[in-house]
Amino acid sequence: MRCLPVFVILLLLIASTPSIDARPKTKDDMPLASFNDNAKRILQILSRKPCCSIHDNSCCGLG
């Protein structure tokens, strides 16, 4: 029973924290989804090139 008031206080403190990011966004901030989209786009471009393969990527400038 001694822990109950401490637990209630901690619960109230956790519930009162802001649910949004407190840091202001800068122009360099980029959502993670755009990084994933860029990676998918690059992989699609590389898979379209006939010379790019897992074993021989010398003509793509990767190896």
UniProtKB/Swiss-Prot annotation:
Tissue spec. comment: Expressed by the venom duct.
UniProt KW keywords: Amidation, Cleavage on pair of basic residues, Disulfide bond, Secreted, Signal, Toxin
Residues of the propeptide: 23-47, 62-63
GO molecular function, one term: toxin activity
Source species, domain of life: Eukaryota
Signal peptide region: 1-22
Pfam families: Chi-conotoxin
Compartment(s): Secreted
Tagged with keyword Disulfide bond: yes
Positions where Cysteine amide occurs in the chain: 60
Reported modifications of this chain: Contains 2 disulfide bonds that can be either 'C1-C3, C2-C4' or 'C1-C4, C2-C3', since these disulfide connectivities have been observed for conotoxins with cysteine framework V (for examples, see AC P0DQQ7 and AC P81755).
Main location: secreted
GO cellular component: extracellular region
Domain notes: The cysteine framework is V (CC-CC).
Family indicated by similarity: Belongs to the conotoxin T superfamily.
Name the UniProt record assigns to this protein: Conotoxin LeDr243
Organism: Conus litteratus (Lettered cone)
